[in-house]
Amino acid sequence: MSYFRRRLSPIKPSDPIDYKDVDLLRKFITERGKILPRRITGLTARQQRDLAVAIKRARILALLPFLNQEG
């Protein structure tokens, strides 16, 4: 019988995901500016949805780039 270790979320469930916290949001996008999938980030489904909304808001307000041309 094998046991699976439960992965802990990198963000505490009680912590809000804010679109103004650009340093936190940058951890969850690729160098090209794409949002990382949930299986890579280790977030819960609710946190991943909130993260996607926050990243999209930050992009609209020009806090994050839509497409990063540097990479």
UniProtKB/Swiss-Prot annotation:
UniProt KW Signal keyword = no
Q: Subunit arrangement?
A: Part of the 30S ribosomal subunit. Forms a tight heterodimer with protein bS6.
Q: Does the keyword NADP feature in the UniProt annotation?
A: no
In the record, what terms sit under GO molecular function? small ribosomal subunit rRNA binding; structural constituent of ribosome
Under the heading PROSITE patterns, the entry gives: RIBOSOMAL_S18
> What does the protein in this record do?
Binds as a heterodimer with protein bS6 to the central domain of the 16S rRNA, where it helps stabilize the platform of the 30S subunit.
Q: What is this protein called?
A: Small ribosomal subunit protein bS18
Give me any GO biological process, just one.
Answer: translation
Give the UniProt entry's GO cellular component terms: cytosolic small ribosomal subunit
> What's the source species for this entry?
Synechococcus elongatus (strain ATCC 33912 / PCC 7942 / FACHB-805) (Anacystis nidulans R2)
Family (UniProt): Belongs to the bacterial ribosomal protein bS18 family.
InterPro entries listed in its UniProt record: Ribosomal_bS18, Ribosomal_bS18_CS, Ribosomal_bS18_sf
Q: What PANTHER family does the record point to? A: 30S RIBOSOMAL PROTEIN S18 (PTHR13479), SMALL RIBOSOMAL SUBUNIT PROTEIN BS18M (PTHR13479:SF40)
Q: Which UniProt keywords apply?
A: Ribonucleoprotein, Ribosomal protein, RNA-binding, rRNA-binding
